[in-house]
Amino acid sequence: MENTQENPTDQTTEETGREAQAAENAAPAAEAALAEAQAKIAELQESFLRAKAETENVRRRAQDDVAKAHKFAIESFAENLLPVLDSLEAAVGDTSGDLAKVREGVELTLRQLTSALEKGRVAALNPVGEKFDPHLHQAISMVPADQEPNTVVAVLQKGYTIADRVLRPALVTVAQPK
């Protein structure tokens, strides 16, 4: 009688051989996948470093642009003041003694200065008749007046703003409560 049963040892050897063959076939594929992953990592690292350098360059350029904007804004403002300086120097050098002429020159110089300040977005505060605002005004005194309480009655010294920011509050007298 012939033995039709397979030997369990033969079956185990055959399975081990197939597993070994599969492992040998998988090794190059795994190595290729590893090499591909390492290449991708290197590419991403390089891309990250470039992006980081570009971000740093953009930040530096932005800082330079802001510094230049400040510099040129001041330069423009100073340029607008030069005609005022010229007028004042001419007035100081005038020896004619004609007071009417000097007064006319001073008024012209004041208009030049006001114009230069307006170009620099500096505006005067003249709050007579307005409600007292502690952000814009500084009350020096309170006086009895016909106006409503806390209304500005007189301006002792003008205040100034630049681009909606207070440079100097107006010194004012305010109507006291009745």
UniProtKB/Swiss-Prot annotation:
Coiled coil: none annotated. The keyword Transmembrane does not apply. GO terms for cellular component: cytosol. Residues 1-11 have a biased composition (Polar residues). It comes from the Bacteria. It is found in: Cytoplasm. One of its GO terms (biological process) is protein folding. Pfam families: GrpE. Belongs to the GrpE family. Participates actively in the response to hyperosmotic and heat shock by preventing the aggregation of stress-denatured proteins, in association with DnaK and GrpE. It is the nucleotide exchange factor for DnaK and may function as a thermosensor. Unfolded proteins bind initially to DnaJ; upon interaction with the DnaJ-bound protein, DnaK hydrolyzes its bound ATP, resulting in the formation of a stable complex. GrpE releases ADP from DnaK; ATP binding to DnaK triggers the release of the substrate protein, thus completing the reaction cycle. PANTHER family: GRPE PROTEIN (PTHR21237), GRPE PROTEIN HOMOLOG, MITOCHONDRIAL (PTHR21237:SF23). Homodimer. This is Protein GrpE.
